[in-house]
Regions:
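Glycine-/small-residue-enriched transmembrane alpha-helix faces in small-molecule transporters
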Residues: 2-48, 156-186, 206
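Hydrophobic/aromatic residues within transmembrane alpha-helices
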Residues: 38, 47, 51, 99, ...
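Specific transmembrane alpha-helical segments of multi-pass solute transporters/efflux pumps
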Residues: 27-34, 60-112, 122, 148, ...
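Helix-helix packing/entry segments at the starts of transmembrane helices
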Residues: 25, 48-50, 89, 108-114, ...
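Hydrophobic transmembrane alpha-helices of multi-pass small-molecule transport proteins
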Residues: 59, 122, 131-153, 263, ...
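Specific alpha-helical transmembrane segments that line the substrate/conduction pathway
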Residues: 46-57, 93-133, 173, 255-275
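Transmembrane alpha-helical segments that form core, pore/gating elements
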Residues: 33, 59, 119-121, 125, ...
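Membrane-interface helix termini and inter-helical loops of multi-pass transporters
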Residues: 33-41, 101, 105, 150-163, ...
Length: 306
């Protein structure tokens, strides 16, 4: 192998990883679009349950070897896996799809883009992770962006704490998912797809009481034809494809560099909301997006200098 070939190998790996990460961010951004399209086509909790049922069936078919090998380790940590699947996969998505009934996909995407800051706060509270001044400034900018979106750019609404219910729910969902992300530090030493399958199974099981509650409240809606299409789409794209691409990208360039690419999620979500759903993109959306992405960039700079 020549020196040029050796030098080109890391570049090819990086290029492939960037492709995988772009696909991941695109799929996660699409989840906001699917959430909005699902309104009137399928009820939120039923969408969550059917989504994870389809994922479990797909993983059982294509990843059964890895699951079988890791089954003893998974059984030993069943309590942890049940809690993680219930929170990170079932509850997060349940709140997410409920929120889609009372806010826009643009708002969902921008607020979800602040997820790294929620993880930052969670890591500090749980593990006392060292914090730099730049990280604090970045967090403040990002939260300002979230507040700007939630108040629709109105200082009066912000001062009166008048926020759309959907925006508040997305903030809550992000906080829950941040807790899930922080708790991943304690994951069992198993293959990524085995872990994913276990969490998906736990999410399906724990979503069933949520569906029962939805039915008891008279809010259960069986999927229309469009609803069934959305179920398949959310199972394949934001779930299986996004997770597969992310796992492959992390293996190629590591979690630190991979995480930065997730900043593309609100950009893709906003672009798709405008082009597919015809949603308006106001000046305050642009300002909020700049604040969120700028805050995350500043925080990453602070981490690098720590």
């Amino acid at each position: 192998m020549t020196l040029d070939t050796k030098a080109a190998a890391p570049e090819r790996a990086s290029a492939l990883a960037y492709f995988f990460l772009t696909c991941t961010a695109l799929c996660w951004g699409a989840n906001a679009i699917f959430g909005r399209l699902a309104v009137g086509e399928i009820s939120p909790m039923l969408l969550v349950a059917l989504r994870w049922l389809v994922v479990v069936m797909l993983l059982a078919a294509f990843a059964k070897g890895a699951i079988r090998r890791d089954l003893p380790a998974l059984k030993a940590r069943w309590g942890y896996l049940a809690a993680m699947g219930a929170l990170g996969f079932a509850t997060f998505n349940g709140i997410y799809y409920v929120a889609a009934h009372s806010t826009t996909a643009v708002n969902i995407g921008i607020i979800q883009g602040a997820m790294p800051m929620f993880v930052f706060f969670g890591a500090f509270l749980a593990y006392r992770t060292p914090v730099t001044a730049l990280q604090v400034m970045g967090a403040a900018l990002t939260m300002a962006g979230v507040a700007l979106v939630a108040s629709a750019g109105s200082l009066e609404r912000l001062a009166a704490f008048e926020f759309a219910p959907g925006d508040v729910l997305i903030v809550l969902a992000c906080a829950i998912y941040a807790g899930y992300t922080v708790a991943l530090r304690r994951r069992p030493p198993v293959a990524a797809f085995s872990m994913f399958a276990a969490l998906a199974g736990a999410a399906f099981a724990t979503s069933l009481p949520m569906v029962a509650a939805e039915a008891a409240l008279g809010r259960l809606q069986w999927p229309t034809t469009t609803g069934w299409i959305i179920v398949v789409l959310v199972a394949i794209f934001p779930s299986v494809i996004a997770q597969t691409c992310f796992i492959k990208a992390v293996a190629l360039i590591g979690p630190g560099r991979a995480g930065v690419f997730m900043n593309l999620t609100p950009v893709f979500a906003s672009a798709m909301a405008i082009s597919i759903l015809g949603e308006a993109f106001e000046a305050f959306h642009a300002a909020a997006l700049c604040l969120v992405l700028g805050g995350i960039w500043l925080s990453e700079r602070g981490k690098a200098g720590a």
